[in-house]
Amino acid sequence: MSEIQGVARFTFHEGKVEEFKRLCAQVMDVVRAKDIGTLQYVIYLNDDQSEGVVYERYQNSEAVIEHATHVGDLMEAIFATGSVSGELLGEPSAELTAATAGSGVSIFRPFLSM
């Protein structure tokens, strides 16, 4: 099984960045307490805090699915803070590919690397 990376890009609705930050703090607590296969989870904001990026690294597809299960209750509220796009990078399992089907998440498989 190969490492999977995720990128979620947010453009916040007016007045929603503080809500995003509050919810992300809760997500981070869950990630630290429950996720086993999460290697990296970083939340970035641009200078005027109108946009954010969540960068995620997981040991494998199973770790992504585990993470989604742990934070699932918070996702609807987080997605309501702005418009969101997402990408998965790597070789996701058939189960993860099926789980993301229809979600708007784009999957990018390796082409060249070193």
Regions inferred by a protein language model and the residue ranges of each:
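Short S/T/G/P-rich N-terminal loop/turn motif that feeds into the first structured element of a domain
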Residues: M1-G52, Q59-H70, F79-M114
